[in-house]
């Protein structure tokens, strides 16, 4: 099956290229850029030399429709909202890595993203692409809104608790830390090496755009869920996310019950790895892979559950999950082309 990538020169775009070039079923028909049309991708990223030869093309929907069946959008917020209706109109399936179609309520999108929302008709058509929790809907979708990286790590960690109804609905606290690639390719003062090296920073306190995305998904599984407390930090690693999540249980639990809850929730999910009791993952253990690793603890003194969830923000948090969703759409095994062992070093 032929695919096209729009926004091929950003970090999400080049990770899609790396994965799709090794995929046994999908093949890249075309790469598209806004600012580097006519450049060979190997001139922009020499690490692709002798691996693929593609010239970056302008975005011509009619030409894309002739060559591809699925389009991956690795574009900034706002761009996908403009392009997607045109792509859908010619029968293309779209997997969007931006946040433009994650929120069903356009008012909430505009409140958090500070820009105009996509058309409501297209928003209604979009399926939120959290692969392990939306398989049947993804299978039939024409437009998939790939989840945000923080939202992916957090939701995979909390949804078994929310679905089971065993936690206090107003008790969810999420502390999240991300490598600097999560901030995107465009440099800022905060991501400048002297500012970040030997340092860490909290940012977007109570204002991160993944907050409503997480809350929307939690409400699908429990309408009583209250607003969450969510903080994000930038740490001096290139890729990786660690989420530490806390919630208070409604009644006394045994750690064995919680362990069983998670093992059963994800027993059919090849990319979710639950650690043995008392063990907790770190970002290095999933780097370069599509895995989400989790560890579980329960504090009898406070009645709080602690879940530690780690992903590679460029893989399970972006390009990897996008291809997992494409596999579902195409009727393939979810693991097709994604069976990469983590790069520990």
Curated annotation (Swiss-Prot):
Q: Which GO terms describe its cellular component?
A: cytoplasm
Say where the protein is mainly found: cytoplasm
So what does this thing catalyse?
N-acetyl-L-glutamate 5-semialdehyde + phosphate + NADP(+) = N-acetyl-L-glutamyl 5-phosphate + NADPH + H(+)
Identify the catalytic residues. Answer: 149
CDD domains according to UniProt: AGPR_1_C, AGPR_1_N
Q: List the disulfide bonds in this chain.
A: none
Name one matching Pfam family.
Semialdhyde_dhC_1
Q: Which UniProt keywords apply?
A: Amino-acid biosynthesis, Arginine biosynthesis, Cytoplasm, NADP, Oxidoreductase
Query: Which pathway is recorded for this entry?
Result: Amino-acid biosynthesis; L-arginine biosynthesis; N(2)-acetyl-L-ornithine from L-glutamate: step 3/4
Q: Which InterPro entries match?
A: AGPR_AS, AGPR_type-1, NAD(P)-bd_dom_sf, NAGSA_dehydrogenase, Semialdehyde_DH_NAD-bd
Reported EC number(s) for this entry are 1.2.1.38
Per its UniProt entry, which superkingdom is the organism in?
Answer: Bacteria
Regarding protein family, the annotation reads:
Belongs to the NAGSA dehydrogenase family. Type 1 subfamily.
Give the matching HAMAP family.
ArgC_type1
Q: What does this protein do?
A: Catalyzes the NADPH-dependent reduction of N-acetyl-5-glutamyl phosphate to yield N-acetyl-L-glutamate 5-semialdehyde.
Q: What is this protein called?
A: N-acetyl-gamma-glutamyl-phosphate reductase
What species is given as this protein's source? Bacillus anthracis
């Amino acid at each position: 099956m032929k695919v096209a990538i729009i926004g091929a020169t950003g970090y999400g775009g080049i990770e899609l290229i790396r994965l799709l070039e090794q995929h046994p079923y999908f093949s890249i028909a075309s790469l598209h850029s806004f600012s580097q049309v006519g450049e060979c991708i190997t001139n922009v990223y020499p690490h692709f030399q002798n691996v693929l030869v593609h010239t970056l093309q302008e975005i011509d929907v009619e030409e894309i429709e002739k060559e591809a069946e699925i389009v991956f959008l690795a574009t900034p917020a706002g761009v996908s909202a403009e392009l997607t209706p045109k792509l859908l109109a010619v029968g293309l399936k779209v997997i969007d890595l931006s946040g433009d179609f994650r929120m069903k309520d356009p008012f909430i999108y505009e409140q958090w993203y500070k820009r105009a929302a996509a058309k409501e008709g297209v928003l209604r058509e979009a399926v939120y692409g959290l692969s392990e929790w939306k398989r049947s809907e993804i299978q039939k979708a024409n437009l998939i809104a790939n989840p945000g990286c923080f939202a992916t790590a957090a939701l995979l960690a909390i949804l078994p608790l929310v679905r089971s109804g065993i936690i206090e609905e107003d008790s969810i606290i999420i502390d999240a830390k991300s490598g600097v690639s999560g901030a995107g390719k465009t440099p800022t003062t905060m991501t400048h090496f002297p500012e970040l090296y030997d340092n860490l920073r909290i940012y977007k306190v109570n204002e991160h755009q993944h907050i409503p995305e997480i809350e929307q998904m939690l409400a699908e599984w429990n309408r009583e869920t209250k607003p969450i407390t969510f903080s994000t930090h930038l740490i001096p690693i290139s890729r990786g996310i660690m989420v530490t999540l806390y919630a208070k249980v409604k009644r006394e639990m045994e750690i064995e019950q919680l362990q069983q809850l998670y093992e059963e929730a994800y027993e059919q999910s090849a990319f979710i790895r639950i650690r043995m009791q008392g063990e907790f993952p770190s970002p290095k253990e999933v780097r370069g892979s599509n895995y989400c690793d989790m560890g579980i603890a329960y504090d009898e003194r406070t009645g709080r559950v602690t879940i530690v969830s780690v992903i590679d923000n460029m893989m399970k948090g972006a390009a990897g999950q996008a291809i997992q969703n494409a596999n579902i759409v195409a009727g393939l095994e979810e693991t097709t082309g994604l069976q990469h062992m983590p790069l520990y070093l």
